[in-house]
Each structure stands twice: as C-alpha cells, then as structure tokens.
C-alpha cells in the first residue's frame, strides 16, 4: 500500500470512529469518587493503522490499562502496542511498552470528551532480513509521543475512543491512528 493510500484509509477509519462515537447514546459519567485517584480502574484494547518512517503502513494492535487520575481530568494509561511490516525484503517489527498521560477537556452537556497528551515508551525494534542480506538486527530505543483524541463513555463501565498519535523514535518515527474500547471496573 502506498503512503497516500494508507493515510486516506487511516483517515476514513478515524472519521468512522468519531461518527460512531457521536451517534452512540452516552450514559451518565460514573461518580467522581469512583474515578478519582490512582489504581487499576479498567482494561482495554486498541487497533489501528501505523505508518512507520521508511516502511509501508500496517496494522497496530495494543492493550492498555486505565490507571486512574492523579489530579482531576489527568489520566495515566500504561500500554503495550505491536506492529510488524515487510519492507524491501526485510521484516520490521516494534513492540512498545510505555505509559501515556492524557488530559481530558470535558464539554458541558456533551457526550464526547476531547483529550490531548503525551508519553514515553521503550520500543523493541527488530529487523529480520534474508540470510544473504545481512541477517537481522534488534535494538531497544526510547520514544516520546504526542497524541490527541476523542472518547465517549457509552455506559458506566464501557468507553470507546479514537486517537491520533505520533511517536518520535530514532530511525522509526511513527504516525498512528487508532480506536478502541476501555472496560472500566465499577467498585
């Protein structure tokens, strides 16, 4: 898939996720006592497109934890993401373990909550080449990311989201457009 086609495809998915969130019925937000403080508040999954520097676009898969708020509207989200793509006979993959900090911008009376944030992650990048082309290599790199998105708390224990993220990783910068869900534990 070429770069223009992958960006158009990713934008179509993002618009679809936002449309789904805008048409879904929102449930009242959980009481603030349930959402305040740090702790294991929920678990979720994500899927989307990643466009790594110097390679074709591919599917990005991930899992995340809602670790709560350390101040009002500021969330901690530990996560793991993985993608793999073949480029010029070389398979490149990235397993990322990281944590994001997202700031919510609640809209009074609105069902959708925009957010922005950033984070740090360890990227375990691996390149596998055929035996005649040097074999392969692996490296661990520290990455910084920025992101923005929209989330919708559809039910007290289920929320959906769509986000755009850019990872700054040496030699493997990545644009990601993802969507997913978070199941919140109510206790």
Regions found by a protein language model. Give the residues of each.
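Extracellular loop and loop/strand-boundary signature of outer-membrane beta-barrel proteins
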Residues: 48-51, 85-89, 130-136, 165-167
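Outer-membrane beta-barrel "beta-signal"
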Residues: 173-187
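Glycine- and aromatic-enriched membrane insertion/assembly motifs of diderm outer-membrane
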Residues: 34-108, 157-160
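Outer-membrane beta-barrel proteins
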Residues: 54-56, 85-90, 125-129, 171-175
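Cleavable N-terminal export/targeting peptides
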Residues: 1-38, 187
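Mid-chain, well-packed structural core segment of small domains
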Residues: 112-130, 139-143
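Residues on the lipid-exposed face of transmembrane beta-strands in outer-membrane beta-barrel proteins
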Residues: 45-49, 61-67, 99-103, 118-122, ...
């Amino acid at each position: 898939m070429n770069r223009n086609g992958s960006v158009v495809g990713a934008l179509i998915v993002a618009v679809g996720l936002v449309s789904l969130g805008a048409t879904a019925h929102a449930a009242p937000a959980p009481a603030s006592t349930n959402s305040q403080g740090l702790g294991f508040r929920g678990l979720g999954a994500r899927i989307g497109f990643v466009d790594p520097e110097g390679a074709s676009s591919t599917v990005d898969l991930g899992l995340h934890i809602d670790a709560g708020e350390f101040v009002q509207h500021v969330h901690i989200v530990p996560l793991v993401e993985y993608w793999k793509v073949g480029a010029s006979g070389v398979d490149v993959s990235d397993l990322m373990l990281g944590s994001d900090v997202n700031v919510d911008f609640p809209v009074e009376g609105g069902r959708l909550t925009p957010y922005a944030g950033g984070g740090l992650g360890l990227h375990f990048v691996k390149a596998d080449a055929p035996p005649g082309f040097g074999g392969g290599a692996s490296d661990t790199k520290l990455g910084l990311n920025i992101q923005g998105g929209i989330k919708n708390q559809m039910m007290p224990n289920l929320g959906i989201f769509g986000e755009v993220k850019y990872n700054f990783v040496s030699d493997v910068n990545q644009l990601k457009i993802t969507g997913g869900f978070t199941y919140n534990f109510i206790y």
